């Protein structure tokens, strides 16, 4: 249910908080460094970790502070003015997103959800075995029919059986891709093993001997990244340690992932390019793994698959309800 509620998160937040999410288009954009300086001045006790670049001329900057789910600050891309801020957990859709991704309890919640997704796959498998007609494939068509004129108990049974078989395929995809997001390193290794693909290169580090020099502005990093690849920049990950690199994330035209999976790593002190990861040229294992997130969110097929994702996300509640009614009826009969 929570997953269905955040499929259209961006659209919902733009409707609820229009003053934070969109601005009128006017002139040239202000330098990104201007926005960063304004944020650091306004929030001196907080740590800026990443910047979401505007995807449309109207969209604002989103600056994440302290961690991925901490303080969200929004800025006008044309004036550099800060428009407002909130903690993700203090907004309804943000709270639902945290419930969906970590049960509101952090890393432990993620692991619980990952195991639950594995159990859902097992339930789908056992459900398929129970759905399979006892007389074999000759009577398989009965498993796809609902007898609407039947007594209500048989109607509930048919709704559970037919709804389950139609939802099963999509639920397995959602569950498996959910597992890949929680246990990403394990699933990535498995994908690489199955496809005989090499692993992604290790994250490069900055040379700390450059500390103390005049650090290039963020706009210089972005201009250099654009010279390397003209694809749109989606996120900038700022270094959180003296050794960390500054990462510019880009989305290639052929990518399904909404944020892209192409990365350019820079030395944070010198702007030297340390590594370029082009999603279009990645090994097959990495390319397959990169489809799991857009499959999980339904974005891979545009609006139709996003709507389908909402419907499929509601199906476990329907199956649980009909299954509970069937269990209760059997219990009454056995008394």
Language model features: what each stretch is:
Residues 1-335:
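Conserved histidines in hydrophobic membrane contexts and catalytic metal-binding motifs
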């Amino acid at each position: 249910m929570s997953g269905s509620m955040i499929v259209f998160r961006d659209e919902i937040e733009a409707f609820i908080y229009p003053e934070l999410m969109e601005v009128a288009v006017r002139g040239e954009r202000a330098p990104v460094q201007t926005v960063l300086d304004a944020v650091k001045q306004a929030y001196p006790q907080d740590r800026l970790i990443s910047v979401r670049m505007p995807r449309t001329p109207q969209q604002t900057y989103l600056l994440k502070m302290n961690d991925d789910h901490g303080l969200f600050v929004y800025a006008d891309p044309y004036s550099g003015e800060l428009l407002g801020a909130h903690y993700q957990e203090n907004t309804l859709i943000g709270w639902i997103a945290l419930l969906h991704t970590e049960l509101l309890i952090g890393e432990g919640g993620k692991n619980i959800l990952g195991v639950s997704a594995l159990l859902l796959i097992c339930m789908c498998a056992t459900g398929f075995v129970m759905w399979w007609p006892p007389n074999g494939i000759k009577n398989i068509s009965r498993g796809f029919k609902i007898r609407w004129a039947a007594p209500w108990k048989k109607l509930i049974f048919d709704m559970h059986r037919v709804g389950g078989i139609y939802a099963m395929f999509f639920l397995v995809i959602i569950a498996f891709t959910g597992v890949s997001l929680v246990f990403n390193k394990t699933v990535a290794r498995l994908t690489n093993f199955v496809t005989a693909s090499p692993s992604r290169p290790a994250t490069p580090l900055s040379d700390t001997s450059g500390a103390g020099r005049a650090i290039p502005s963020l706009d210089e990093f972005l201009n250099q990244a654009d010279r390397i690849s003209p694809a749109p920049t989606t996120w900038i990950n700022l270094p959180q340690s003296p050794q960390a690199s500054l990462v510019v994330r880009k989305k290639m035209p052929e990518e399904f992932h909404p944020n892209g999976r192409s990365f350019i790593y820079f030395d944070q002190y010198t702007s030297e390019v340390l590594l370029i990861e082009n999603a279009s040229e990645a090994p097959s294992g990495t390319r397959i793994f990169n489809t799991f997130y857009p499959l999980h969110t339904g974005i891979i097929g545009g609006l139709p698959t996003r709507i389908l994702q909402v419907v499929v996300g509601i199906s476990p509640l329907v199956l649980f309800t009909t299954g509970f009614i069937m269990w209760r009826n059997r219990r009454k009969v056995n008394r």
